[in-house]
Amino acid sequence: MKGKTGNSQSGFTLVELMISVTLGLIITSSMVQVYQSNNKLQTYNYALSNIQQDGRYIISALRQSLMMVGMYNEFSANLDRSVDVEIEGRFIKDHPVVLEADFALEPTLGSKEGTGSNPDSLVINMMDVDSCTGSNFDFADGSEFHTVNEYFLDETTLRCRGHDGRFLRGLKPNGASGQSVALLENVHNFQVLYGISQPTAGVETGAVTSWISADRLVAFVNADGSLPVVGIKLAMLIKNDDDIVIENTRSLKMLGHDKFTPSDDGLYRVFETVIVFRNVWHEVTAGG
């Protein structure tokens, strides 16, 4: 009589099963870590791209606006001639940067140095068809006139307020403007240094001989009342507004101030530029 032969089946032992589960958890954990790392890197790169775009935009916009500081062409066919254009031209060329008390109707209007590390403000004179807000202050469309633009930081928004220079000089009955436009948000500091040109060995070259803050400008006003500012340095501290947390260990530095580390975990970058006032440089070197 033949005996029965059974088919025996073997499975995972408990030890093998535990090893498999452990390896699976390790692989899954590694994949999650890689995913999180890639996700953080992608978020960081996106935030960095946005802040770089904001920085390039505002630098380009300010350079385009401020390059013409001190410009006045009394021979322009579009210049409004309801005032003495020779006197107006001399005023703008001698005062490219506005200081406090330059305008009797608004004596507090002027470029200011912020206390401590607080933001600065910049006020300039030029000839244009409108102010930085787009207003032409009831001049005919396309007419050029004395424009005063004031750049300042309102909390974390860089703004510009336009003024009618002829009104400020008492030559018009109206023209005051309290309106301002936002140039860029998420700006946490705005610093300005002014390039002063003084003669070297008795020769005026138009080169910057010193960079100073706004509170020292008065000391460099010439005997004839002119201010030899031929350029400016601008610095802006911009923060990205994306929801990103970064441990800040990188020190930053603004113009004329000590290094600092941001107090929160946002992404910050400092953007700087130098702008030469070509028209003022010509006035200084040519002697008017």
Predicted features, each with a name:
Residues 40, 44-48, 55-228, 235, ...:
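N-terminal pilin/flagellin-like segments and related low-complexity appendage regions
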Residues 233-236, 272-274:
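Active-site scaffold segments
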Residues 2-71, 286:
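Aliphatic-rich helix starts adjacent to a transmembrane/signal segment
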Residues 272-288:
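Charge-rich, low-complexity intrinsically disordered segments
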